From Swiss-Prot:
It comes from Dictyoglomus turgidum (strain DSM 6724 / Z-1310). Its EC number is 2.4.2.1. Substrate binds at residues 181, 205-207. This is Probable 6-oxopurine nucleoside phosphorylase. InterPro entries: MTAP, Nucleoside_phosphorylase_d, Nucleoside_phosphorylase_sf, Purine_phosphorylase-2_CS. Pfam families: PNP_UDP_1. Although this enzyme belongs to the family of MTA phosphorylases based on sequence homology, it has been shown that conserved amino acid substitutions in the substrate binding pocket convert the substrate specificity of this enzyme from 6-aminopurines to 6-oxopurines. Pathway: Purine metabolism; purine nucleoside salvage. GO terms for molecular function: S-methyl-5-thioadenosine phosphorylase activity. Purine nucleoside phosphorylase which is highly specific for 6-oxopurine nucleosides. Cleaves guanosine or inosine to respective bases and sugar-1-phosphate molecules. Involved in purine salvage. CDD domains: MTAP_SsMTAPII_like_MTIP. Homohexamer. Dimer of a homotrimer. The lineage of its organism: Bacteria, Pseudomonadati, Dictyoglomota, Dictyoglomia, Dictyoglomales. It catalyses: a purine D-ribonucleoside + phosphate = a purine nucleobase + alpha-D-ribose 1-phosphate. Phosphate binds at residues 9, 49-50, 82-83, 182.
Length: 263
């Protein structure tokens, strides 16, 4: 299995996969349930990060188990989806954003596989947090199939599960484009495992203080439901275009440490 999709809020069923089968993977961090199926002859995995029916809040997701499970199955490429609030007036509900940067405002999450417990510590480069190769395929494909997607976006990740205050949003809007609760530490852990990771955010609402109305989770789900077909269509078109050989920074993220015998 080379490719996996991680579905966020409102994305619990890949639908385009043939013969989907639930599998369980044991990891040092806990058991993970996911689906595997076939798309155009390619075995593809699908993991619902919030669990079936959105039963796991963002701050309780077992990110390390999820990423370890995908790595153990041989996954080299991950396409993820996230529901986000917009920090900019030009990013309207229903828009897709192909993320290129993130800012981490989480507080209580385990961000690394290398905590030093076994004497191993790494300091990984994050100049390009999201796989440039996958991002380019996503954007070029979106143009080919007529789906509007913003080619860049900075994701501000908060701890959750509450929505943000207008004061927080005012601060975040100075340096971010969208705000969500799940991309960190997922993107970090993927790089530590040398997995290519790209994320498409679907704008579901304007953030607090930008929107004149109070925010509700039902509003997020409603907009996600109305627009999720765009994400499915994009991923379905992208998967056959993902090359078997990787020509990106991700596959050698730990090369320096391996060469020095530190891993």
């Amino acid at each position: 299995m080379r490719i996996a999709i991680i579905g966020g809020t409102g994305v619990y069923d890949p639908k385009f996969l043939e013969n989907p089968e639930e599998i369980k993977v044991s990891t040092p961090y806990g058991e993970v349930k996911l689906l595997k199926g076939i798309y155009q002859g390619e075995e593809v995995g699908f993991l619902a990060r919030h669990g079936a029916g959105h039963t796991v809040p963002p701050h309780r997701i077992n990110y390390k188990a999820n990423m370890w499970a995908l790595k153990s199955l041989g996954v080299e490429r991950i396409l993820s989806t996230t529901a986000v609030g917009s920090l900019k007036l030009n990013l309207v509900p229903g828009d897709l954003v192909i993320l290129d940067q993130f800012i981490d405002f989480t507080k209580n999450r385990d961000h690394t596989f290398y905590n030093g417990d076994d004497g191993k510590v790494i300091h990984i480069d994050f100049t390009n947090p999201y796989c440039p190769e996958l991002r380019n395929i996503l954007y070029e494909t979106s143009k080919e199939i007529g789906i509007k997607a913003h080619p860049f976006g900075t994701y501000v990740c908060t701890e959750g599960p509450r929505f943000e205050t207008p004061a927080e949003i005012k601060m975040y809007s100075f340096f971010g484009d969208v705000v969500g609760m799940t991309n960190v530490p997922e993107v970090i852990l993927a790089r530590e495992l040398e997995i290519c990771y790209a994320s498409v955010s679907l704008v579901t609402n304007y953030a607090a203080g930008i929107s004149p109305n109070p925010l509700t989770h039902s509003e997020v789900l409603e907009v996600m439901t109305q627009n999720i077909e765009k994400v499915r269509k994009l991923f379905a078109a992208v998967i056959p275009k993902i090359p078997k050989e990787r020509n990106c920074i991700c596959k050698n993220a730990l090369k320096e440490y391996r060469e020095k015998g530190l891993l």
